[in-house]
């Protein structure tokens, strides 16, 4: 095979459509746009959810509105009532809760809620406590210790790395 034998694939080079060059061309007058109307006009056309003036589906379904907060933190929830049989000498931590299968996911922060009764004094370490849970824990003679939960948030800036800012000023 030589260089002059090479040919593009069949149908790879398509001729440009010449619109509005008389009805003999097949694309004269309306240029393939059909008769008059909103879709025949130039420009971007109606918005995606437009239904011709009828109340659109997005508006008819109120639960589909709003936005999703990407910074929202979801918690693994444990009620105080589920800690009734907990041994007094064992601290309640996210790791021990995971080992006893009271929480499912390791990578989520733990919140203690105040549903149920607590009788024994427990030392509970969690990332968040409801007011009623904290009150019940302290009323039973235990301690509610807050743990910090660090969320790694990436910068939305596409500019230079902020940590390199001082390095470039030489």
Curated annotation (Swiss-Prot):
Q: Does the entry feature the keyword Signal, yes or no?
A: no
Bias kind Basic and acidic residues: ranges: 1-12
Q: Which GO terms describe its molecular function?
A: rRNA binding; structural constituent of ribosome
- Pfam families the record matches: Ribosomal_L27A
- Keywords per UniProt: Ribonucleoprotein, Ribosomal protein, RNA-binding, rRNA-binding
Q: Which InterPro entries does its entry note?
A: Ribosomal_uL15, Ribosomal_uL15/eL18, Ribosomal_uL15/eL18_sf, Ribosomal_uL15_bac-type, Ribosomal_uL15_CS
Region feature Disordered, mapped onto this chain: 1-52
One of the GO biological process terms: translation
PROSITE patterns named among the record's database cross-references = RIBOSOMAL_L15 (PS00475)
GO CC field: cytosolic large ribosomal subunit
Q: Report biased composition (Basic residues) as residue ranges.
A: 13-26
What HAMAP family does this protein's entry cite? Ribosomal_uL15
Function statement: Binds to the 23S rRNA.
Of which family is this protein a member?
Answer: Belongs to the universal ribosomal protein uL15 family.
NCBIfam families documented for this protein: rplO_bact
Q: What is annotated about its quaternary structure and interactions?
A: Part of the 50S ribosomal subunit.
The protein's name in its UniProt record = Large ribosomal subunit protein uL15
User: Which organism is this entry from?
Assistant: Chloroflexus aurantiacus (strain ATCC 29366 / DSM 635 / J-10-fl)
